[in-house]
Amino acid sequence: MREIMKILIITGKLAERKVKDAVKKYDFIDVHVANISVAAFLTPNLIIKEIKKLENKLGKKLKDIYDFVLVTGLIRHDLKNVEEETGIKCFKSTREASDIPILIENLDKIKLSTKEYADLQLLEIIRKKCEEEIKKAEEQELGEGDIKIGKLKVGDKFPMRVLGEIVHAPWLKEKELEEKIIYYLESGADMIDLGMVSNENNADKIKDMLKIARDLTDNPISVDTLNTKELIEAINLGADMILSVDAGNLDELIPYLKDSETAVVVLPTNYKTNYVPETIEGKIKSLEENIKKLIDAGIEKIVADPILEPINNAGCSFIESVIACREFKKRNKLPLFFGVGNVTELFDADSNGVNALLAAIGAEIGANILFTPEASAKCKFSIKELKIASKMMFLAKKRNSLPKDIGYNLINYKDKRFEEEITFNSYNIPIIKAEEDERQILDEGSFKIEIDRKNKEIVAIYFNKRREPVLIIRGKKPKEIYETAIRLNLIKKLDHASYFGRELAKAEIALRIGKKYNQDFDLFL
């Protein structure tokens, strides 16, 4: 009777080397190469044939040699029939050969499936471990320099907190504000910032806005303005934090802050006199002076904001502002505010990589709050990106490792490992150069495709020949939409079917990455 586990892996000819390299350190794993070039083309019937062929060669049933079979590749079929026909359990492996070792090391933690690849379960295991680490850290008591903003612990022992600003909050209708807050919370915001409007006094709207926010969440709510009347109203109404205090309004606010639980973000500026320090030492000196006045007045919940500057900024540069943040943190044991949005909103680049790098810089210099609006379209998903980056950097620092193979990543548009099966060079068959043909035979009707971003759905509106709307098909995935259209006999021409599928795929990509979708126009120019 076998006591040591043995596994057989079945793969195709093209993946043979990758699979064998991936499992070469395991002496209890054998690899069988099926008589097929691409593993993805394997079907249950072909696998059964391969198993029976191998059994004839060995003179034994595979179930007497191996505990189970793993099949590699992007196989679409359920492999349940394989065990029914051969008697040996057969499961799907990981999508990528390079991930097989991770699967092998975690066999005791997952349930192998005949339908689903093992990748998602492996990711869940890694993520669960990460979340447990973070949860354990959240249970720590406050240390030196740490504070509580509302019920949220902020300080060096905890992950960097993400503060999402709702720009021009007083201009939003109640429903719009609610939707924005819900979206920010779903994106992972630890705190919600109600951004006021420059050169306006909307103090009378703060009470209602705070109520709307607090009816939706227990997360801390801050009010962002330099208007002294608005700041006083926010303090009196019990806002969890105010942004911002500087030399110009500090003296007026101290009497109200003394007896409140409101945390205060302090700047090195005096906007009343248009003073903005433009050197590293100037930033630090002014900030320390403003903070000293607050401390002397008995105010303890202080967050320092040396002001992170945009790239290529006139006056104090981005790099100088980073150095100012770092030097201030070295000299002062206070929570540090890091205005990431000052950079991303003024930088024409996809936000995810910029946010990842800025969060990493923030972690190295000791930042505790990552602040961002999602004011421009290019910065959509910034809150979600910063939340992921915060977790990555917290775990990397805790484990004393690089922000790589952590369990979280911000690789959205490329791949960490690039593995493609290329077969076209192996076929000795005619090659036909593709050419467009502008001739089209019109179908009986047509579709207008749109995106419902609120419900995260693709919408296909069907029009008859008279251009009258007839019905709407809604769905999350192109497949369910085009299969519904075919089932309803709305598409009869091949070129229309091809066009419809292409446009649905474009809409799905646009919905997923937050890009604008216009039917008949390329997503990427």
Swiss-Prot record:
<dbReference type="GO" id="GO:0005886">
    <property type="term" value="C:plasma membrane"/>
</dbReference>
<dbReference type="GO" id="GO:0004150">
    <property type="term" value="F:dihydroneopterin aldolase activity"/>
</dbReference>
<feature type="transmembrane region" description="Helical">
    <location>
        <begin position="353"/>
        <end position="373"/>
    </location>
</feature>
<dbReference type="GO" id="GO:0009396">
    <property type="term" value="P:folic acid-containing compound biosynthetic process"/>
</dbReference>
<protein>
    <recommendedName>
        <fullName>Uncharacterized protein MJ0107</fullName>
    </recommendedName>
</protein>
<dbReference type="InterPro" id="IPR005236">
    <property type="entry name" value="Dihydropt_synth"/>
</dbReference>
<dbReference type="Pfam" id="PF14251">
    <property type="entry name" value="PterinBD-DUF4346"/>
</dbReference>
<dbReference type="GO" id="GO:0005737">
    <property type="term" value="C:cytoplasm"/>
</dbReference>
<dbReference type="InterPro" id="IPR045031">
    <property type="entry name" value="DHP_synth-like"/>
</dbReference>
<dbReference type="Pfam" id="PF00809">
    <property type="entry name" value="Pterin_bind"/>
</dbReference>
<feature type="transmembrane region" description="Helical">
    <location>
        <begin position="28"/>
        <end position="48"/>
    </location>
</feature>
<keyword id="KW-0472">Membrane</keyword>
<comment type="function">
    <text>Unknown. Does not possess dihydropteroate synthase (DHPS) activity since it does not catalyze the condensation of 6-hydroxymethyl-7,8-dihydropterin pyrophosphate (DHPP) and 4-aminobenzoate to form 7,8-dihydropteroate.</text>
</comment>
<dbReference type="Pfam" id="PF20123">
    <property type="entry name" value="DUF6513"/>
</dbReference>
<keyword id="KW-0812">Transmembrane</keyword>
<dbReference type="InterPro" id="IPR000489">
    <property type="entry name" value="Pterin-binding_dom"/>
</dbReference>
<feature type="domain" description="Pterin-binding">
    <location>
        <begin position="146"/>
        <end position="394"/>
    </location>
</feature>
<dbReference type="InterPro" id="IPR025595">
    <property type="entry name" value="PterinBD-DUF4346"/>
</dbReference>
<dbReference type="InterPro" id="IPR045406">
    <property type="entry name" value="DUF6513"/>
</dbReference>
<keyword id="KW-1133">Transmembrane helix</keyword>
<dbReference type="InterPro" id="IPR011005">
    <property type="entry name" value="Dihydropteroate_synth-like_sf"/>
</dbReference>
<dbReference type="GO" id="GO:0016740">
    <property type="term" value="F:transferase activity"/>
</dbReference>
<keyword id="KW-1003">Cell membrane</keyword>
